[in-house]
UniProtKB/Swiss-Prot annotation:
Keywords: ATP-binding, Isoprene biosynthesis, Kinase, Nucleotide-binding, Transferase. GO terms for biological process: isopentenyl diphosphate biosynthetic process, methylerythritol 4-phosphate pathway; terpenoid biosynthetic process. HAMAP family: IspE (MF_00061). This is 4-diphosphocytidyl-2-C-methyl-D-erythritol kinase. GO terms for molecular function: 4-(cytidine 5'-diphospho)-2-C-methyl-D-erythritol kinase activity; ATP binding. The lineage of its organism: Bacteria, Bacillati, Bacillota, Bacilli, Bacillales. It catalyses: 4-CDP-2-C-methyl-D-erythritol + ATP = 4-CDP-2-C-methyl-D-erythritol 2-phosphate + ADP + H(+). Its EC number is 2.7.1.148. Gene3D superfamilies: 3.30.230.10, GHMP kinase, C-terminal domain. ATP binds at residues 94-104. Belongs to the GHMP kinase family. IspE subfamily. The keyword Secreted does not apply. The active site is at residues 10, 136. It comes from Bacillus anthracis. Pathway: Isoprenoid biosynthesis; isopentenyl diphosphate biosynthesis via DXP pathway; isopentenyl diphosphate from 1-deoxy-D-xylulose 5-phosphate: step 3/6.
Amino acid sequence: MKLLVKAPAKINLSLDVLGKRQDGYHEVKMIMTTIDLADRLELMELAEDRIEILSHNRYVPDDQRNLAYQAAKLLKEKFNVKKGVSITIEKTIPVAAGLAGGSSDAAATLRGLNKLWNLGLTIDQLAELGAEIGSDVSFCVYGGTAIATGRGEQIEHIKTPPSCWVILAKPHIGVFTADVYGNLKLNRVTHPNVDKMVDVINAGDYKGICDTVGNVLEDVTFAMHPEVARIKAQMKRFGADAVLMSGSGPTVFGLVHHDSRMHRIYNGLKGFCEQVYAVRLLGERETLE
């Protein structure tokens, strides 16, 4: 039996770090929303008891470093599944980009194998399992728009922001989240107003959303990789309604309401950035249907 599953990327409309926890993780408060840029996974049941990862993308590991592999392994061990699975990952989301591509692949694997192996788990149970794999996996199981707290695994759903274009530009570098957090000095950064962002999203206030976007990690990544700051400045000059770095970077996104301006910004960015995408916000949460 074979199953196709979609794994959408996420952006952070607001990201704050409150402090470091005793377990070594950072306490965060952020708003994430899924966008229509997605990897596609094909899950095929194997009679033999093994996990196989296949991808044409050379940056996708085919062993337990891969979060989709970890998701399959977790389900096999927790529920004593004796069958195997072959997971083919068609990558569209850039790797190490701040868009939760690996986490979304893991979440899609959890949802898909729940169906393929007839495990009968609820989406809440899958999200709880996702937290054992990575901080963003719980959110990616649900999708939609949510406030994430704790280390990112505590999810509270909120309304979907008004529909708009999201233009993404990723420079030809990868950023490691641990390096960014390691250089973060909480008393030297600008903290965004996450609560205000919740209010303007719930009010459907597009201008308010654009005025309130913020990411506490931006200055850290900009200092390490000045080219990320240059992309943000360029996107602003081209006329995006709001511009922000997603996650720990290096991808920068712009929110744009009008089609004509979206095309102008997209074409302008293609002139000096290799990976540029224009996609829409995804309004709906995932279901198990």
